[in-house]
Design a protein with these regions (language model features):
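N-terminal active-site segment of His-dependent metallophosphoesterases
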Residues: 1-68, 146
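Glycine-rich phosphate/diphosphate-binding loops that line cofactor/substrate pockets in enzymes
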Residues: 40-46, 75, 151, 278-280
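Glycine-rich, Lys/Arg-enriched anion-binding loops that position phosphate/diphosphate groups
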Residues: 200, 204-209, 213-226, 230-266
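Short, well-ordered beta-to-alpha junction loops that form the rim of enzyme active sites
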Residues: 53, 159-162, 289-292
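Core dinuclear metal-dependent hydrolase active-site scaffold
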Residues: 1-3, 125-131, 234
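His/Asp/Glu-rich metal-coordinating catalytic cores
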Residues: 48, 59-211, 215-220
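Accessory, non-catalytic peripheral segments of nucleic-acid enzymes
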Residues: 32, 43, 236-296
Length: 296
């Protein structure tokens, strides 16, 4: 059984440093990334796709953004399971309960709006951990793992948020406790943990079964977001053995270029390096210059 793990589409996102035609082109690229995810899923023989939170940038979006997103999802060749995250929680203003979303939601799109176990195929369950507010007061994942049986069912946890090992902050009560996750893996209650929230592809712990897929299209500069633009294809066989493969889907780059400038040659070299950037129409460069130049 194969599935595609993705997260953090944040459809409707705007970037303050994109001007003119760049912003609509970037927005279109984020929608096109969904189509690319569908192509990967079909080509790799995936049974379904999980989107682990922050599908939308917020719950307050222009109707056009919602309609365009659902239309792209309609064309994805597999079932798509959407998890509400911190940007689009299941609160009173949730996009997922809006009249527009419910009226236009395609048959292949399913919202994981109830915490707990959801059968997707015989012998395979998703353990959904949706956000109902922007600030949970406890570890939502540990709550769902408590008492989960090791009964031979292959289970994928679909969750969103930070993990205590990566962000050990005692002031954040909603952090996911890695020990509870790894204990559930060790006893055979769960077999993979699909995470969203971190926009760079990241393996968590040493089990090989806990991953952030990262965002399918870049959202920040590379000194902040080191490895975006991927989706993960997860192959989980009947024995519980697993294989995780990354596939590139992103097309944009947000690059921080640090350069020392002390003379005319340095300026010329900088210009040459900028000229050599490929795909300039999809590359944003932030310059960080150091050095001393004469005013004459």
């Amino acid at each position: 059984m194969k599935f595609l793990h993705t997260a953090d589409w944040q459809l409707g996102m705007t970037r303050h440093f994109l001007a003119g035609e760049a912003q609509p082109q970037y927005s279109a690229a984020r929608r096109e990334a969904i189509a690319s995810l569908g192509e990967v899923a079909v080509a790799q023989g995936c049974d379904f796709m999980v989107v682990c939170g922050d599908v939308f940038e917020s719950n307050q979006l222009a109707p056009r953004v919602i309609s365009q997103a659902l239309e792209v999802m309609r064309g994805v060749g597999v079932d798509v399971y959407l998890l509400p995250g911190n940007h689009d929680p299941l609160d009173a203003a949730s996009v997922y309960t809006s009249e527009l979303f419910l009226a236009e939601k395609p048959a292949n799109v399913h919202v994981l709006d109830t915490a707990g176990r959801h059968q997707v195929t015989p012998g395979v369950e998703l353990v959904a951990v949706p956000w109902r507010s922007k600030a949970p007061t406890h570890d939502l994942v540990a709550e769902q793992l408590d008492g989960l049986p090791a009964d031979g069912t292959r289970r994928i946890v679909v969750a969103h948020g930070g993990v205590d090992m990566l962000d050990p902050d005692p002031t954040k009560p909603a952090l996911i406790a890695l020990k509870a996750v790894e204990d559930a893996i060790d006893r055979g209650a769960i077999h993979y943990v699909a995470l969203g929230d971190k926009h760079s592809r990241t393996q968590v712990g040493s089990s090989g079964r806990v991953w952030y897929s990262g965002a399918p299209e870049v959202t920040n500069y590379d000194d902040v977001e080191s490895d975006p633009g991927h989706a993960l294809v997860v192959d989980l066989d009947e024995s519980g053995a697993i294989r995780v493969d990354a596939h590139d889907v992103g097309r944009w780059r947000f690059v921080t270029l640090r350069w020392s400038v002390d003379n005319a040659r340095d300026i010329a070299d900088l210009g040459l390096n900028l000229e050599l950037f490929p795909d300039k129409e999809r590359t944003v460069v932030r310059l960080a210059l150091t050095g001393t130049l004469s005013v004459t």
